[in-house]
Amino acid sequence: AEDELGIGTDHQGIMVLEPEAVVGTAAKDYLGLKTDTIFEIGLTPNRIDGASHIGVARDLYAYCKLRNIPVEFALPSVEGFSKGEGESIPVRVEAPDLAPRYIGITIKGVEVGPSPDWLKERLMMIGQRPINNIVDITNFLLNENGHPLHVFDAAKIEGRKVVVRRSTPNCKFVTLDGVERTLSSEDLVICNARNPMCIAGVFGGEDSGVTESTTDIFLESAYF
């Protein structure tokens, strides 16, 4: 099965190859697998700075520099991105003690679909299941820089505003897994003009999630 080979999540049974598959062809060549190395790093609680790819790379850079080992790195280009003309979604933080920093950006004209193979492969290498390009890239960035992101369907943000506040007592909220949960006034929630959309830093809501029909998104980055 795909999951047993580490190339997918399907566990329905033995993989059936296409009729044109030539007997004797190496599975690596037929499946287009790349030769790579995965490092499994055991972190102690005091080294949370290493709980990301960039965190590990930063430590390796220091190690190499002390030993005069040349290291090359490249910063990603951000050319081609420009500020749009549309109206932005304002953010109001009503619980700064629980959310000292909250920022967001609206991105329009996205197309939700399968991720490219390179992204799927990198997520599966670290034990994560690819879902779609929007969810996958946020998970990829989480593991790359150690900071979580969350995406809302911008069209589902009632009142075109985002409010960060404490929940009202005994508030009923349905999370992405379809389970109704009861919140307390100790819970921090991300809301639209009327209702909660997300339990901050914990679980997204069923009514604000990205679907195949999503075209505009609101991307959240916060410190809770």
Region annotations inferred by a language model:
Residues 1-83, 193, 218:
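Phosphate-backbone binding interfaces of nucleic-acid-interacting proteins
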Residues 24, 121, 138-207, 212:
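Conserved mixed alpha/beta core segments that line enzyme active sites in large multi-domain catalysts
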Residues 34-38, 86, 100-102, 214:
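A general secondary-structure signal for short beta-strands and their flanking turns/coil
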Residues 38-42, 49-55, 59, 104-106, ...:
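Structured core elements
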Residues 59-62, 66, 124-128, 143, ...:
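Short, intrinsically disordered, mixed-charge
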